[in-house]
Amino acid sequence: MEHPLECADSCSLAMSWFCNKKCRGWGLMKRTVVASGLRSVVLLLLFIYFVQDVTAEMGHQRISGSAGDVLEDNPVGRLKVFIYDIPSKYNTDWLKKDPRCLTHMFAVEEYLHDFLTESPVRTLNPEEADWFYTPVYTTCDLTPNGLPLPFKSPRVMRSAISYISSHWPYWNRTDGADHFFVVPHDFAACFHYQEEKAIERGILPLLKRATLIQTFGQNHHVCLKEDSIVIPPYAPPERMQTRLNPPSTPRSIFAYFRGLFYDPGNDPEGGYYARGARAAIWENFKDNPLFDISTEHPATYYEDMQRAIFCLCPLGWAPWSPRLVEGVIFGCIPVIIADDIVLPFADAIPWEKIGVFVEEKDVPILDKILCTINHEEVLEKQRLLANPAMKQAMLFPRPAKPGDAFHQILNGLARKLPHDPSIYLQPGQSFLNWTEGPPGDLYPWGNDL
């Protein structure tokens, strides 16, 4: 749809979305704003007035990703999972040492363990299992500030794999090809928070044949295997549910973002953090009245997202962010600025229909890109975001609920069945090299918690 005005600035374009039938022509608006100094302010006020019509009641509809209408599929009866009973030093001892592991954005590894333990897909008979799960917590070694230290993780994971391969026959039967592991850190099984170091390390060699469940997703990247299942990061469902605005709350913010633009502690010279995308957002739009952006994280953060049309989701050190989850939950259209990102449950969730993708190099014209999206497309994205199945698929609630992210993980595993017969090895055959990897990763790991 063509806009009725060829506007020279972003504020004018933004207004073109929300001009409903009560507005009699764009000439009136153009004549209203004569003084250039008042132009942005007046147009922003008009924008706030007209945007209230966008929050009208919307109907729900079925959602289809590339795998079809699968968000509401029930995985029970489609797969069986055997959980290895391994020593607590690999999992719950970490939690006893630091319960903050249950509240950070990597907490899915703990919660998935609990979920599978009680799930009807669990089998106690490994001979009938389709999948084998090793509950290793690789993001629960925290700094005083609550950030995970992944540097021990390769040794912890190697130790756990050595344990299951020496106590059960199933790992050696396939070299782990029918096993899955949860690796929710920034760059997953590359086990480093800086991309350059993660690429240098690569995926832990012993996991080459296993299926990885990870938050990191980027095409053509050494830290993502083709058969990995990309999941959303953990965001506390209860906290978000208690902060919901009334449905009639108008969306009076055009574009919203809270977070770092620079990371002087880890990137003192600038330009490396977020590949410069966040810095470009700040430098180009810090004074633009359409953009509500700041490093300050207000107490009303969740409420503010519910008043925004667009929520910016730029990459940080890694391409993924909890803002993706928050945007979907709060009906704020995610603006995804992360080249080649692979999004959570991409075969089930139609991200192209609910979000806006902006290449990192195009950040300086972000205002123009957003303002050329027509009114009908905005409404359609909001209509899809309003679907309860969409929101449920992004959350890890306790107790679990049908269609939630736990069930989407199981659905993803079920869609990989049956296993190809070629994964089963001949006696004495193996594709793994237990001495491969950085020398520091090969040191034994024991009870050094």
UniProtKB/Swiss-Prot annotation:
BP term (GO), one: xylan biosynthetic process
Tissue specificity remark: Mostly expressed in newly formed or expanding tissues.
Record topological domains on the Lumenal side: 53-449
CC per GO annotation: Golgi membrane
KO phenotype (gene knockout): No visible phenotype and no significant change in monosaccharide composition of the cell walls.
Residues on Cytoplasmic side: 1-31
Enzyme Commission number, as recorded: 2.4.-.-
Glycan-carrying positions: N172, N433
Record's keyword terms, sorted: Cell wall biogenesis/degradation, Glycoprotein, Glycosyltransferase, Golgi apparatus, Membrane, Signal-anchor, Transferase, Transmembrane, Transmembrane helix
Membrane topology annotation: Single-pass type II membrane protein
Membrane-spanning ranges: 32-52
Taxonomic superkingdom: Eukaryota
Family to which the UniProt record says this protein belongs: Belongs to the glycosyltransferase 47 family.
Function field: Involved in the synthesis of glucuronoxylan hemicellulose in secondary cell walls.
Listed name of the protein: Probable glucuronosyltransferase 47 A
Organism: Physcomitrium patens
Gene that produces this protein: GT47A
